[in-house]
Amino acid sequence: MALSFGTDGVRGIAHSELTTKFVQIFGRAAAEEFQSCSWLVGRDTRESSLPLAKFLANGLASTGGEVFDLGVVPTPLVAAASKIEEMPAVMVSASHNIWSDNGLKIFGPGGLKLSDGSQKSIEQRIKNLLETVPNEISEQQATPY
């Protein structure tokens, strides 16, 4: 796995390191880890954020869960909504990094930072899924959320 957890999530060059395939698999791995039926997803205004959010939502929903699109919002709003709704959440943003980067910042239910154990578990799930999922995930496979 080329990308691994840094502080609260993963970051990389959008569509090069942080590919749609990786983002969809990240979503599935996170959904499997939390076994949650509902997720919140927010994003920033980067050009890559909307398509990445769509693939992320597909991954999160692949285990039968529901995904709520918060739209373009600041990261603290995603954390606050996660806390209020007691749902895990993901923010698609690379924060202060350059425009070509993007990232996935994940919050546990209640807006909490993930434990090291949860991060390691998600990383292992991603590694396992990357080995078993076909190499090409096309834009047509991403359904709007």
Q: What is each residue range found by the language model?
A:
Residues 21-32, 76, 80, 120, ...:
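Short, contiguous clusters of charged residues that form electrostatic/catalytic patches at enzyme active sites
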Residues 31, 37-112:
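Ferredoxin-reductase
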Residues 13, 104-145:
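Gly/Ser/Thr-enriched, mixed-charge loops and adjacent short helices
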